[in-house]
Amino acid sequence: MAKGDPKKPKGKMSAYAFFVQTCREEHKKKNPEVPVNFAEFSKKCSERWKTMSGKEKSKFDEMAKADKVRYDREMKDYGPAKGGKKKKDPNAPKRPPSGFFLFCSEFRPKIKSTNPGISIGDVAKKLGEMWNNLNDSEKQPYITKAAKLKEKYEKDVADYKSKGKFDGAKGPAKVARKKVEEEDEEEEEEEEEEEEEEDE
């Protein structure tokens, strides 16, 4: 089942994919009533492909090349970057972390070091419990820092939109945000888990 934009061009096929498609069509013609056993069929195709000469494979190579040209042309007309996502502008301001994520970035390494082999889910659960057990005054430093980062982010976005590029201002806030973002990007799965824990 295709996901996402139905207008997105069909993916390009490899020479082997064209070969398998041809084998499937041959099978249907010879045995229209016999359903294809996918595992067995794939194995036979693979074995047959390995024994074919370069000359025999060349027909499928040409088909794959033609399909690549078709795909590249359609993708160019289609617009969005591969995968249906717009390419991220590396200079665009990055979304700032919340107070909870700042807390997580500080305590996640400590939990991992004291609990070797702990799963992502358990780390997130522990972080969620720790955060929920903090009183307001203990949470305040993280919330204040997050608010400052958000304020700077909003200014950066305004700059970015007005100038068409991001003014790469240096400063402790940007450095702190960059550090947190790098860690967050590396552990996106953990963030998703942590968001759930924070909401509970």
Curated annotation (Swiss-Prot):
GO terms for molecular function: DNA binding, bending; double-stranded DNA binding; four-way junction DNA binding; RNA binding. The modification N6-acetyllysine is found at residues 3, 30, 43, 112, 139. One of its GO terms (biological process) is innate immune response. GO terms for cellular component: chromosome; cytoplasm; nucleus. Disulfide bonds join 23-45. Residues 182-200 have a biased composition (Acidic residues). The modification Phosphoserine is found at residue 98. Reduction/oxidation of cysteine residues Cys-23, Cys-45 and Cys-104 and a possible intramolecular disulfide bond involving Cys-23 and Cys-45 give rise to different redox forms with specific functional activities in various cellular compartments: 1- fully reduced HMGB3 (HMGB3C23hC45hC104h), 2- disulfide HMGB3 (HMGB3C23-C45C104h) and 3- sulfonyl HMGB3 (HMGB3C23soC45soC104so). The modification Cysteine sulfonic acid (-SO3H) is found at residues 23, 45, 104. The keyword tRNA processing does not apply. It is found in: Nucleus; Chromosome; Cytoplasm. Keywords: Acetylation, Chromosome, Cytoplasm, Disulfide bond, DNA-binding, Immunity, Innate immunity, Microphthalmia, Nucleus, Oxidation, Phosphoprotein, Repeat, Transcription, Transcription regulation. Belongs to the HMGB family. It is linked to Microphthalmia, syndromic, 13: A form of microphthalmia, a disorder of eye formation, ranging from small size of a single eye to complete bilateral absence of ocular tissues (anophthalmia). In many cases, microphthalmia/anophthalmia occurs in association with syndromes that include non-ocular abnormalities. MCOPS13 patients exhibit colobomatous microphthalmia with microcephaly, short stature, and psychomotor retardation. This is High mobility group protein B3.
